């Protein structure tokens, strides 16, 4: 059985994710800040988004580690639990979006674009949520 604070944290996190889903998921490839608007073919665009996803993941991991350095042990556990839930949400959400194109050549591209956009958004969210703490302890936000 989960403690009430952890259960409440999970519910709050999932509600937040559902609220942000519409913002983060619609037409990733056509978003003004999408990194792969130039390539013409599906294969080129998919490769671009896979590469961009790796870059977004590296940036997310960097800010996640930096945030962990300024948190107490309990706060680190909360962040870790939230991050695990977010990863499950992101992967499941992007799989559902990909499945809308099942059997089509766009499916891998849609999945890669979704992963990239959601990962980039998570980095932005973590910076917004923990930026004050990073500044307080003299850690650069980037």
Which stretches of residues belong to each language-model region?
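Bacterial N-terminal signal peptides that target proteins for export
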Residues: 2-13
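Repetitive helical segments and hydrophobic/amphipathic motifs
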Residues: 16-19
């Amino acid at each position: 059985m989960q403690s009430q604070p952890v259960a409440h944290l999970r519910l709050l996190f999932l509600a937040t994710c559902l609220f942000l889903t519409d913002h983060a998921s619609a037409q990733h490839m056509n978003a003004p800040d999408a990194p792969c608007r130039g390539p013409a073919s599906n294969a080129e665009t998919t490769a671009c988004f896979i590469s961009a996803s790796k870059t977004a993941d590296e940036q997310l991991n960097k800010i996640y580690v930096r945030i962990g350095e300024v948190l107490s042990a309990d706060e680190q556990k909360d962040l870790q639990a939230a991050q695990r839930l977010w990863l499950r949400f992101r992967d499941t959400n992007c799989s559902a979006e990909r499945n809308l194109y099942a059997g089509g050549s766009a499916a891998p591209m849609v999945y890669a674009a979704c992963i990239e956009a959601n990962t980039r958004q998570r980095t932005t969210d973590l910076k917004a949520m923990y930026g004050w703490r990073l500044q307080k302890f003299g850690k650069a936000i980037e």
